[in-house]
Each structure stands twice: as C-alpha cells, then as structure tokens.
Design a protein with these regions (language model features):
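Acidic/glycine-enriched connector segments
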Residues: 1-115
Length: 116
C-alpha cells in the first residue's frame, strides 16, 4: 500500500511505525522538515520504497508547496496527516484528500521530540 505521510513542520513522529498499516510498500512525502523528515528516516531504515515530491518553485512560484501536496495525495492510497492545529498546508492536504476521495487519517499533536 502506498501511504503518504504529511504534516506540520513543527512536529516529529518518532514512533511512525505505530501509525502505518502492516502492508505499507511505499511511503510518499514532501521532503520538508518535521514529519516529512521522520517519514524519510523510517522508510530508509526499514527498507521501504520512498517517493518524495519537492516543491517546484521555478514552475509554480508561491503555490509550489500546494501543487506538491496535490501530487502526494494523487499518488497515495492512504494519507496520514499529523497536524499541529495551525499548519495551513496540512489542512489543505486534508481537504484535497476529501475532494479526491483518498482515505486519510488525521492525528492532532503537540510538538514532539525529534525522530530517530
């Protein structure tokens, strides 16, 4: 299963494996700080395929992070969103999941220790 892991840059998820389904075959993320870094570290340390979409500022300007989030949602079969209650990018991604019919789960969190 292709699982997108997205979230606020102020958060980390040191126990990411607790949230992932057992049949995860690929982790999709955005290559940013915080949650995305934890997704990358988990995928690499567990031999799971990692697909990262980076914002293309040259092509999309200020909308680049949102366009990147659209690609992430389109690739995913499930989206795990870790939200700090403030991040507009995470809220945008949740709304895109709804619009595109992609299953998602939202985890509301406070700042956490860094990922391994």
């Amino acid at each position: 299963m292709r699982v997108a892991v997205v979230g606020s840059r102020t958060l980390t998820v040191p126990n990411l494996g607790d949230y992932l389904p057992e049949n995860v075959s690929e982790i999709v993320s955005g290559g940013a700080r915080g949650v995305d870094q934890c997704a990358r570290a988990y995928a690499l340390s567990h031999g799971i395929r990692l697909t990262e979409y980076l914002p293309d500022y040259a092509r999309h300007g200020r909308r680049a992070p949102l366009m990147r989030n659209d690609l992430i949602v389109a690739r995913a079969e499930l989206v795990l969103a870790f939200w700090d209650g403030r991040s507009r990018g995470t809220v945008y991604t949740i709304r895109r999941c709804r619009a595109m019919g992609v299953p998602y789960r939202v985890f509301r969190a406070a700042e956490a220790p860094s990922c391994p």
